[in-house]
């Protein structure tokens, strides 16, 4: 798994899907200021990396969730990855909207899902865990047995880890914030001294003392 984490980190860096701005941080929709932005949608534009990532997702699901019957993507970023992975595994696939449609059948779950089916949620990245837990809850309310989550990248934030643990849902990520920070420094995407700042952010996103200088 450590080899996979490093390889996927190298892949994401090679296609410039990870952006570093420790001195001019990004602001997420939640208001959190972050030195890193990861755009996993760019994986879809890079066929070689896309194949590597989807193959790793297949291997991870087979290893961690061998009883999986259905893959459900998160809307919107997880949909394509769920579709490709499901195709490779010969499994049914659907996705969960962030809210119900206001027309037609007003579905929040798109695709056929039977009560009791064993589901794996496919997510592109996890930060605080809020959005993916909403998906898990929707699926559970529909009667699915959620085996867990597979994600491409996790920030490894304490809040996200605690939320998933409280909801008793397992997550397995292909790579993580710490590995990407380490590889980025080795390959000179960032300065070695910036690694500590990045990890300080990951440890406590509410503490913004890492911004604007080395610590």
Predicted regions and their residues:
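PRPP-associated nucleotide enzymes
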Residues: 1-122, 130-215
